Protein backbone atom coordinates (compact mmCIF):
# COMPACT_ATOMS: atom_id res chain seq x y z
CA UNK A 1 0.00 0.00 0.00
CA UNK A 2 1.02 3.64 -0.46
CA UNK A 3 1.19 6.05 2.47
CA UNK A 4 2.09 9.75 2.48
CA UNK A 5 4.44 11.43 4.94
CA UNK A 6 4.86 15.20 5.26
CA UNK A 7 7.58 16.92 7.24
CA UNK A 8 9.63 20.12 7.32
CA UNK A 9 13.04 20.23 5.65
CA UNK A 10 16.05 22.47 6.13
CA UNK A 11 17.55 23.14 2.66
CA UNK A 12 20.66 25.18 1.99
CA UNK A 13 20.42 28.67 0.45
CA UNK A 14 21.32 27.24 -2.96
CA UNK A 15 18.61 24.57 -2.64
CA UNK A 16 16.07 27.19 -1.52
CA UNK A 17 16.81 29.27 -4.61
CA UNK A 18 16.42 26.22 -6.85
CA UNK A 19 13.11 25.27 -5.21
CA UNK A 20 11.72 28.79 -5.63
CA UNK A 21 12.91 28.92 -9.24
CA UNK A 22 11.26 25.57 -10.03
CA UNK A 23 7.98 26.57 -8.35
CA UNK A 24 8.01 29.90 -10.22
CA UNK A 25 8.57 28.12 -13.54
CA UNK A 26 5.75 25.64 -12.82
CA UNK A 27 3.40 28.52 -12.03
CA UNK A 28 4.37 30.31 -15.26
CA UNK A 29 3.87 27.18 -17.41
CA UNK A 30 0.51 26.42 -15.75
CA UNK A 31 -0.74 29.96 -16.45
CA UNK A 32 0.69 29.81 -19.99
CA UNK A 33 -1.23 26.57 -20.65
CA UNK A 34 -4.48 28.10 -19.38
CA UNK A 35 -3.96 31.30 -21.37
CA UNK A 36 -3.01 29.42 -24.55
CA UNK A 37 -6.16 27.28 -24.46
CA UNK A 38 -8.29 30.33 -23.69
CA UNK A 39 -6.84 32.06 -26.77
CA UNK A 40 -7.52 28.95 -28.89
CA UNK A 41 -11.13 28.90 -27.68
CA UNK A 42 -11.62 32.61 -28.47
CA UNK A 43 -10.31 31.99 -32.00
CA UNK A 44 -12.61 29.00 -32.48
CA UNK A 45 -9.73 26.50 -32.59
CA UNK A 46 -9.48 23.03 -31.06
CA UNK A 47 -8.62 22.56 -27.37
CA UNK A 48 -5.01 21.46 -26.78
CA UNK A 49 -4.46 18.58 -24.36
CA UNK A 50 -1.62 18.57 -21.85
CA UNK A 51 0.39 16.08 -23.91
CA UNK A 52 0.02 18.11 -27.13
CA UNK A 53 0.90 21.34 -25.31
CA UNK A 54 4.03 19.76 -23.81
CA UNK A 55 5.21 18.66 -27.27
CA UNK A 56 4.44 22.08 -28.78
CA UNK A 57 6.18 23.89 -25.91
CA UNK A 58 9.42 21.89 -26.16
CA UNK A 59 9.61 21.38 -29.93
CA UNK A 60 8.22 24.64 -31.30
CA UNK A 61 7.68 27.43 -28.79
CA UNK A 62 10.98 27.37 -26.86
CA UNK A 63 13.20 26.90 -29.99
CA UNK A 64 11.40 29.85 -31.64
CA UNK A 65 11.72 32.00 -28.49
CA UNK A 66 15.31 31.93 -27.18
CA UNK A 67 14.36 34.21 -24.26
CA UNK A 68 12.24 31.34 -22.84
CA UNK A 69 15.04 28.78 -22.59
CA UNK A 70 15.02 29.23 -18.79
CA UNK A 71 11.99 26.92 -18.73
CA UNK A 72 14.35 24.04 -19.50
CA UNK A 73 16.73 24.92 -16.67
CA UNK A 74 14.50 23.41 -13.97
CA UNK A 75 13.37 19.84 -13.25
CA UNK A 76 11.43 18.72 -16.35
CA UNK A 77 9.11 16.34 -14.47
CA UNK A 78 7.89 19.22 -12.28
CA UNK A 79 7.07 21.33 -15.35
CA UNK A 80 5.27 18.41 -16.99
CA UNK A 81 3.22 17.83 -13.83
CA UNK A 82 2.07 21.47 -13.83
CA UNK A 83 0.78 20.99 -17.40
CA UNK A 84 -1.01 17.79 -16.32
CA UNK A 85 -2.61 19.71 -13.44
CA UNK A 86 -3.87 22.32 -15.90
CA UNK A 87 -5.28 19.58 -18.15
CA UNK A 88 -7.02 18.00 -15.14
CA UNK A 89 -8.53 21.38 -14.22
CA UNK A 90 -9.94 21.75 -17.76
CA UNK A 91 -11.29 18.17 -17.70
CA UNK A 92 -13.15 18.87 -14.45
CA UNK A 93 -14.53 22.09 -15.98
CA UNK A 94 -15.78 20.27 -19.10
CA UNK A 95 -17.49 17.65 -16.89
CA UNK A 96 -19.20 20.46 -14.90
CA UNK A 97 -17.41 19.37 -11.71
CA UNK A 98 -15.74 22.75 -11.09
CA UNK A 99 -15.53 26.32 -12.38
CA UNK A 100 -13.23 27.53 -15.14
CA UNK A 101 -9.56 27.08 -14.10
CA UNK A 102 -8.05 30.13 -12.42
CA UNK A 103 -4.64 31.60 -13.04
CA UNK A 104 -2.17 31.11 -10.20
CA UNK A 105 -0.77 34.25 -8.59
CA UNK A 106 2.59 34.49 -6.87
CA UNK A 107 2.26 34.53 -3.10
CA UNK A 108 -1.41 33.51 -3.12
CA UNK A 109 -1.65 30.19 -4.97
CA UNK A 110 -0.35 26.89 -3.63
CA UNK A 111 2.17 25.70 -6.25
CA UNK A 112 4.48 22.78 -5.48
CA UNK A 113 7.63 21.25 -6.92
CA UNK A 114 6.82 17.69 -7.99
CA UNK A 115 9.43 14.94 -8.20
CA UNK A 116 9.23 11.26 -9.09
CA UNK A 117 11.43 8.18 -8.74
CA UNK A 118 12.77 7.16 -12.17
CA UNK A 119 15.61 4.94 -10.93
CA UNK A 120 16.59 3.48 -7.51
CA UNK A 121 19.12 6.25 -6.80
CA UNK A 122 16.74 9.15 -7.52
CA UNK A 123 14.79 9.17 -4.25
CA UNK A 124 16.50 7.83 -1.15
CA UNK A 125 15.86 8.46 2.51
CA UNK A 126 18.07 8.22 5.55
CA UNK A 127 17.16 8.98 9.15
CA UNK A 128 18.22 12.64 8.95
CA UNK A 129 18.17 13.48 5.24
CA UNK A 130 16.31 12.90 1.97
CA UNK A 131 17.62 12.75 -1.60
CA UNK A 132 15.50 14.72 -4.09
CA UNK A 133 16.16 14.90 -7.86
CA UNK A 134 17.98 18.13 -8.91
CA UNK A 135 18.36 19.14 -5.24
CA UNK A 136 20.51 16.34 -3.91
CA UNK A 137 20.55 15.50 -0.20
CA UNK A 138 18.27 17.74 1.89
CA UNK A 139 18.26 17.69 5.69
CA UNK A 140 15.05 16.70 7.51
CA UNK A 141 14.09 18.54 10.70
CA UNK A 142 12.05 15.68 12.19
CA UNK A 143 14.59 12.86 12.16
CA UNK A 144 13.34 9.30 11.73
CA UNK A 145 9.80 10.28 10.70
CA UNK A 146 9.99 9.07 7.09
CA UNK A 147 10.70 5.31 6.62
CA UNK A 148 14.27 4.86 5.37
CA UNK A 149 15.56 3.15 2.23
CA UNK A 150 17.88 1.06 4.40
CA UNK A 151 14.84 -0.59 6.01
CA UNK A 152 13.51 -1.60 2.59
CA UNK A 153 10.97 1.18 2.02
CA UNK A 154 10.62 2.82 -1.40
CA UNK A 155 9.66 6.43 -2.20
CA UNK A 156 7.49 6.60 -5.31
CA UNK A 157 7.01 10.36 -5.69
CA UNK A 158 6.70 13.56 -3.71
CA UNK A 159 6.32 17.33 -3.65
CA UNK A 160 8.24 20.22 -2.13
CA UNK A 161 6.23 23.24 -1.00
CA UNK A 162 6.88 26.62 0.63
CA UNK A 163 4.53 28.06 3.24
CA UNK A 164 5.19 31.20 5.29
CA UNK A 165 8.90 31.01 4.51
CA UNK A 166 9.16 27.37 5.65
CA UNK A 167 9.94 24.42 3.36
CA UNK A 168 8.05 21.13 3.46
CA UNK A 169 8.35 17.80 1.66
CA UNK A 170 5.54 15.31 1.18
CA UNK A 171 6.48 11.84 -0.07
CA UNK A 172 4.49 8.79 -1.13
CA UNK A 173 6.09 5.68 0.36
CA UNK A 174 5.34 2.08 -0.58
CA UNK A 175 4.86 0.07 2.61
CA UNK A 176 3.78 -3.57 3.05
CA UNK A 177 0.11 -4.32 3.64
CA UNK A 178 -0.82 -4.90 7.26
CA UNK A 179 -3.31 -7.58 8.30
CA UNK A 180 -6.10 -5.80 10.15
CA UNK A 181 -8.21 -7.69 12.67
CA UNK A 182 -11.94 -7.06 12.63
CA UNK A 183 -13.01 -4.73 15.44
CA UNK A 184 -15.72 -6.30 17.60
CA UNK A 185 -16.44 -3.24 19.73
CA UNK A 186 -19.68 -1.29 19.47
CA UNK A 187 -19.96 1.37 16.77
CA UNK A 188 -20.15 5.09 17.53
CA UNK A 189 -21.75 8.21 16.09
CA UNK A 190 -20.04 11.60 15.85
CA UNK A 191 -21.91 14.91 15.75
CA UNK A 192 -19.79 17.89 14.68
CA UNK A 193 -20.68 21.35 15.92
CA UNK A 194 -19.59 24.92 16.54
CA UNK A 195 -20.06 25.10 20.30
CA UNK A 196 -18.05 21.89 20.83
CA UNK A 197 -15.95 20.44 18.02
CA UNK A 198 -17.14 16.82 18.24
CA UNK A 199 -19.65 15.00 20.44
CA UNK A 200 -19.39 11.20 20.55
CA UNK A 201 -22.34 8.90 21.23
CA UNK A 202 -20.46 7.37 24.19
CA UNK A 203 -20.65 10.75 25.97
CA UNK A 204 -17.14 11.98 25.18
CA UNK A 205 -16.94 15.64 24.11
CA UNK A 206 -14.02 17.32 22.32
CA UNK A 207 -13.72 21.05 22.86
CA UNK A 208 -13.64 23.77 20.24
CA UNK A 209 -9.95 24.68 20.01
CA UNK A 210 -10.86 28.10 18.58
CA UNK A 211 -12.22 29.11 22.00
CA UNK A 212 -8.87 28.47 23.70
CA UNK A 213 -6.93 31.39 25.17
CA UNK A 214 -3.91 30.65 22.98
CA UNK A 215 -5.78 30.94 19.68
CA UNK A 216 -7.71 34.01 20.80
CA UNK A 217 -4.42 35.69 21.65
CA UNK A 218 -3.03 34.80 18.21
CA UNK A 219 -6.17 36.17 16.52
CA UNK A 220 -5.72 39.52 18.28
CA UNK A 221 -2.05 39.55 17.26
CA UNK A 222 -3.07 38.76 13.67
CA UNK A 223 -5.48 41.72 13.62
CA UNK A 224 -2.68 44.05 14.76
CA UNK A 225 -0.24 42.75 12.14
CA UNK A 226 -2.86 42.97 9.37
CA UNK A 227 -3.63 46.56 10.39
CA UNK A 228 0.08 47.37 10.23
CA UNK A 229 0.30 45.80 6.75
CA UNK A 230 -2.72 47.81 5.62
CA UNK A 231 -1.01 51.05 6.69
CA UNK A 232 2.10 50.11 4.73
CA UNK A 233 -0.02 49.67 1.60
CA UNK A 234 -0.90 53.37 1.78
CA UNK A 235 2.15 53.83 -0.48
CA UNK A 236 -0.05 52.60 -3.34
CA UNK A 237 -1.86 55.94 -3.31
CA UNK A 238 1.45 57.73 -3.76
CA UNK A 239 2.36 55.59 -6.78
CA UNK A 240 5.23 53.79 -5.04
CA UNK A 241 6.09 50.09 -5.39
CA UNK A 242 4.48 47.56 -3.05
CA UNK A 243 7.52 45.27 -3.29
CA UNK A 244 9.53 47.19 -0.71
CA UNK A 245 11.42 45.19 1.91
CA UNK A 246 9.30 46.43 4.83
CA UNK A 247 6.06 45.40 3.13
CA UNK A 248 7.47 41.95 2.33
CA UNK A 249 8.60 41.52 5.95
CA UNK A 250 5.17 42.47 7.23
CA UNK A 251 3.46 40.10 4.77
CA UNK A 252 5.67 37.28 6.06
CA UNK A 253 4.67 38.09 9.66
CA UNK A 254 0.99 37.79 8.70
CA UNK A 255 1.63 34.54 6.82
CA UNK A 256 3.48 33.04 9.79
CA UNK A 257 0.60 33.84 12.14
CA UNK A 258 -1.92 32.27 9.73
CA UNK A 259 0.34 29.22 9.42
CA UNK A 260 0.73 28.87 13.19
CA UNK A 261 -3.01 29.04 13.78
CA UNK A 262 -3.63 26.53 11.00
CA UNK A 263 -1.10 24.13 12.55
CA UNK A 264 -2.78 24.37 15.97
CA UNK A 265 -6.18 23.51 14.47
CA UNK A 266 -4.78 20.63 12.41
CA UNK A 267 -2.93 19.25 15.44
CA UNK A 268 -6.18 19.31 17.44
CA UNK A 269 -7.95 17.40 14.64
CA UNK A 270 -5.17 14.78 14.50
CA UNK A 271 -5.22 14.22 18.27
CA UNK A 272 -9.02 13.98 18.32
CA UNK A 273 -9.06 11.39 15.53
CA UNK A 274 -6.24 9.39 17.13
CA UNK A 275 -8.15 9.20 20.42
CA UNK A 276 -11.37 8.15 18.66
CA UNK A 277 -9.68 5.45 16.57
CA UNK A 278 -7.86 4.00 19.62
CA UNK A 279 -11.23 2.86 21.01
CA UNK A 280 -11.41 0.49 17.98
CA UNK A 281 -15.14 0.81 17.18
CA UNK A 282 -16.61 -1.53 14.57
CA UNK A 283 -17.95 1.47 12.66
CA UNK A 284 -18.13 5.27 12.86
CA UNK A 285 -21.12 7.23 11.56
CA UNK A 286 -20.84 10.92 10.71
CA UNK A 287 -23.26 13.33 9.06
CA UNK A 288 -22.90 14.68 5.53
CA UNK A 289 -22.64 18.37 6.40
CA UNK A 290 -23.50 20.98 3.77
CA UNK A 291 -20.42 23.09 4.52
CA UNK A 292 -20.81 25.12 1.32
CA UNK A 293 -24.32 26.13 2.36
CA UNK A 294 -23.22 26.90 5.92
CA UNK A 295 -20.48 29.18 4.58
CA UNK A 296 -23.13 31.36 2.93
CA UNK A 297 -24.39 32.39 6.36
CA UNK A 298 -22.31 35.48 7.15
CA UNK A 299 -22.90 34.99 10.89
CA UNK A 300 -21.49 31.46 10.88
CA UNK A 301 -19.01 31.41 7.99
CA UNK A 302 -15.92 32.37 10.02
CA UNK A 303 -16.69 29.83 12.77
CA UNK A 304 -17.41 27.07 10.23
CA UNK A 305 -14.20 27.73 8.28
CA UNK A 306 -12.05 27.67 11.42
CA UNK A 307 -13.50 24.29 12.50
CA UNK A 308 -12.13 22.61 9.32
CA UNK A 309 -14.90 20.00 9.05
CA UNK A 310 -13.78 18.73 5.64
CA UNK A 311 -10.21 18.17 6.84
CA UNK A 312 -11.58 16.23 9.82
CA UNK A 313 -13.58 13.99 7.50
CA UNK A 314 -10.70 13.27 5.10
CA UNK A 315 -8.25 12.51 7.90
CA UNK A 316 -10.81 10.34 9.70
CA UNK A 317 -11.39 8.40 6.46
CA UNK A 318 -7.64 7.73 6.11
CA UNK A 319 -7.33 6.53 9.72
CA UNK A 320 -10.41 4.31 9.41
CA UNK A 321 -8.94 2.67 6.30
CA UNK A 322 -5.67 2.03 8.14
CA UNK A 323 -7.39 0.44 11.13
CA UNK A 324 -10.13 -1.52 9.38
CA UNK A 325 -12.98 0.66 10.70
CA UNK A 326 -16.07 1.17 8.55
CA UNK A 327 -16.83 4.87 8.05
CA UNK A 328 -20.51 5.54 7.42
CA UNK A 329 -21.92 8.83 6.15
CA UNK A 330 -25.56 9.46 7.03
CA UNK A 331 -27.86 11.10 4.52
CA UNK A 332 -27.59 14.90 4.43
CA UNK A 333 -31.30 15.32 5.23
CA UNK A 334 -31.35 12.75 8.03
CA UNK A 335 -32.92 14.60 11.04
CA UNK A 336 -30.37 13.51 13.63
CA UNK A 337 -30.89 16.57 15.85
CA UNK A 338 -34.70 16.64 15.59
CA UNK A 339 -35.33 12.93 16.20
CA UNK A 340 -35.92 11.64 19.73
CA UNK A 341 -33.49 8.81 20.44
CA UNK A 342 -35.93 7.28 22.95
CA UNK A 343 -39.23 7.12 21.04
CA UNK A 344 -38.22 8.08 17.48
CA UNK A 345 -40.60 11.02 17.09
CA UNK A 346 -39.40 14.03 15.08
CA UNK A 347 -39.62 17.51 16.57
CA UNK A 348 -39.95 19.75 13.51
CA UNK A 349 -39.97 23.08 15.39
CA UNK A 350 -36.53 22.58 16.98
CA UNK A 351 -34.51 25.82 16.80
CA UNK A 352 -30.76 26.27 16.66
CA UNK A 353 -30.93 28.07 20.01
CA UNK A 354 -32.50 25.01 21.71
CA UNK A 355 -29.46 23.33 23.27
CA UNK A 356 -31.49 20.83 25.34
CA UNK A 357 -33.71 18.33 23.52
CA UNK A 358 -37.05 17.78 25.29
CA UNK A 359 -39.52 15.25 23.94
CA UNK A 360 -43.19 14.73 24.82
CA UNK A 361 -42.31 11.20 25.96
CA UNK A 362 -40.27 12.72 28.81
CA UNK A 363 -36.85 12.17 27.24
CA UNK A 364 -34.42 15.02 28.02
CA UNK A 365 -30.84 15.14 26.71
CA UNK A 366 -28.21 17.45 25.31
CA UNK A 367 -29.09 18.33 21.73
CA UNK A 368 -25.70 17.28 20.29
CA UNK A 369 -25.51 14.05 22.30
CA UNK A 370 -28.99 13.12 21.08
CA UNK A 371 -27.83 13.72 17.50
CA UNK A 372 -24.72 11.55 18.02
CA UNK A 373 -26.85 8.70 19.40
CA UNK A 374 -29.19 8.93 16.40
CA UNK A 375 -26.23 8.88 14.01
CA UNK A 376 -24.93 5.75 15.72
CA UNK A 377 -28.27 3.97 15.09
CA UNK A 378 -28.83 5.46 11.60
CA UNK A 379 -30.09 2.96 9.02
CA UNK A 380 -29.81 5.16 5.91
CA UNK A 381 -26.14 5.75 5.14
CA UNK A 382 -23.42 5.14 2.58
CA UNK A 383 -19.90 3.80 3.06
CA UNK A 384 -17.30 6.57 2.65
For each predicted feature, which ranges?
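Gly/serine-rich nucleotide phosphate-binding loop at the start of the catalytic core
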Residues: 1-80
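Positively charged, helix-rich recognition surfaces that bind polyanionic ligands
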Residues: 3, 17, 148-151, 163-384
